[in-house]
Amino acid sequence: VKDRAAKAMILDGIARGALTHDKTIIDATSGNTGIAYAALGAALGYKVALCLPANATEERKKLMKLYGAEIIETDPLESSDGAYNECRRLVAEHPEKHFYPDQYNNDANWRAHFDGTAVEIWEQTEHRVTHFVAGTGTSGTFMGTSRGLKHLNPQVKSVFMQPDSPFHG
């Protein structure tokens, strides 16, 4: 589902004129959204740089690199916070060089799930969904899908899970 949010944030940036081909898409990630950014960047002709903890899986890093993304590894003991802080530092240093979707604070993230994921779940369950359970990271998937399902049926119950370790993703 992370490709939906990445696509929505990138298309929003293009529509607003904030993302142009002279800028690099940069964001913090623990992996999945980063893979989506890298794939979309390759398909649309944008450079991509991704800040992620050094303990992210090699498979994820390899996929990002295969799509041409620059990987900026951060201290694994700082978890996703370290990647987020490094990304913000790099953007502050050279804002003119970067398009920073900021998946943690971008309404296009949760809207992608409100408009897409929730509707798909609703239709695929033939309107019989009663509960929605999701893990949280940026909370975009959980917030958007929960809001969307509750918009379709206020009786739907939403439950979120949170990793018990800072080493998630």
Where are these regions (language model features)?
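PLP-dependent amino-acid enzyme catalytic core
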Residues: V1-G169
